[in-house]
Amino acid sequence: MYNQEVKLTTKEILEKEFKTSMRGYSQDEVDKFLDVVIQDYEVFQKKIERLEQEIHQLRTEAKRAASERQTRHQTSPSVGSTNYDILQRLSNLEKKVFGNKLYE
């Protein structure tokens, strides 16, 4: 997971003032570059928010699936014994209705 803190916000980048000197950088060029950086920051922030929502949703789904799996696992033995009981009853009824002809 990404543990480093973001040092700048889009607002801080936008409001940053640079000192000018005799042979300094072109102010327009710096402003254009910072505009690009701000746009990238906004895109990254939106991606981070979307991915955090997706992580939350997937974790919720995983918990629900695990809970359903556990519930199914707990009820499956009783279903198996119920099926066995039904088959045993059916066998007894067949013996009574058809006699021992089926089992000869």
From Swiss-Prot:
Protein known as: Cell cycle protein GpsB
Pfam families xrefs: DivIVA
Keyword Cytoplasm: yes
Database matches in Gene3D superfamilies: 6.10.250.660
Compositional bias of kind Polar residues: 73-82
Coiled-coil features, chain-numbered ranges: 34-72
Keyword Coiled coil belongs to the record: yes
Listed PANTHER family: CELL CYCLE PROTEIN GPSB, CELL DIVISION PROTEIN DIVIVA
Protein role: Divisome component that associates with the complex late in its assembly, after the Z-ring is formed, and is dependent on DivIC and PBP2B for its recruitment to the divisome. Together with EzrA, is a key component of the system that regulates PBP1 localization during cell cycle progression. Its main role could be the removal of PBP1 from the cell pole after pole maturation is completed. Also contributes to the recruitment of PBP1 to the division complex. Not essential for septum formation.
Assembly behavior: Forms polymers through the coiled coil domains. Interacts with PBP1, MreC and EzrA.
Biased composition (Basic and acidic residues): 60-71
Annotated segments matching region Disordered: 60-82
Family annotation (InterPro entries): Cell_cycle_GpsB (IPR011229), DivIVA_domain (IPR019933), DivIVA_fam (IPR007793)
GO biological process, one term: regulation of cell shape
Keywords from the named record: Cell cycle, Cell division, Cell shape, Coiled coil, Cytoplasm
Family stated for the protein in its record: Belongs to the GpsB family.
GO cellular component, one term: cytoplasm
Subcellular location(s) of the protein: Cytoplasm
